[in-house]
């Protein structure tokens, strides 16, 4: 992309509960990926002239986590702390992408079934604080389907804060059949913290939680047959792996490796009364018209960081096959880049010529106010 073009290119910003993915429309991967964290010092600054800040965002907060209290402004996909969120957006535009937001149309993403007020406030901040010329809010799962090159399918988008099943037919999301599950990566991290405590390793602070998240991402996997895997783990050490903590101490984990993500299939592990992701997928398909179910079964698209566990696609295939009619053809699509497929879908959408009339312009916002977002963005 030449510099001449970059002056009006749309910005795509996928604000996840765990990671912000941002970059320019038309690129094939996000330029900036950093944790959605704002950190504030826990202690009084004593060294004068150190240039200490009262808050840190993203990677800088992550690297100084030992002296900070870390907060995530987005919980379960819903922005709960708007001041911190503004800091994150400011950091995205000015420090990561190094652009002036008033020159770029901006595409944001959100989870389906989010409160309406959440969208309006996002719209308001974009136009009033950052003065963007135009903006749009897209549903995350729909973008993932775009990225996989399909217009029909059922997406299981599981991130850090929220998971959802969205059936889409010929490009239309079917709102009555959307299933939302407030069980995602962060809950799995918390559960892993808990079961590691049973092994005698204690992780408590917000900084230590980040270590556990790293253990989860590096060592966890989904068992094809949970009971059988538990038996294997009990009778041999073949499933044990070691992990070195930042202070050099080495810990060993065994059945925790697959007990942690098993929660996705058995939410009762963390005391949730909900159905597992395989059942929510099936229920969501069953709420759709009988004529389109076949197409949905054949196009199960996984997206989001919490679908990155090895073995998850095979397990989904097995579980959904068990629930579906016996002759049904079932296909699970798990693209290797699914961690970023929401962003990639946004990049595709924002660079389509047909999309250009879909933007909410500053002028429309000034005339109608924040509620315009419900009229223009499905």
UniProtKB/Swiss-Prot annotation:
The keyword Cell inner membrane does not apply. It catalyses: ATP + H2O = ADP + phosphate + H(+). SMART domains: ACTIN. It is found in: Cytoplasm, Cytoskeleton. Its EC number is 3.6.4.-. Disulfide bonds: none annotated. InterPro entries: Actin, Actin/actin-like_CS, Actin_CS, ATPase_NBD. One of its GO terms (cellular component) is cytoskeleton. PROSITE patterns: ACTINS_1, ACTINS_2, ACTINS_ACT_LIKE. Keywords: ATP-binding, Cytoplasm, Cytoskeleton, Hydrolase, Muscle protein, Nucleotide-binding. Gene3D superfamilies: 3.30.420.40, Actin, Chain A, domain 4. Belongs to the actin family. This is Actin, muscle 2/4/4A. The gene is MA2.
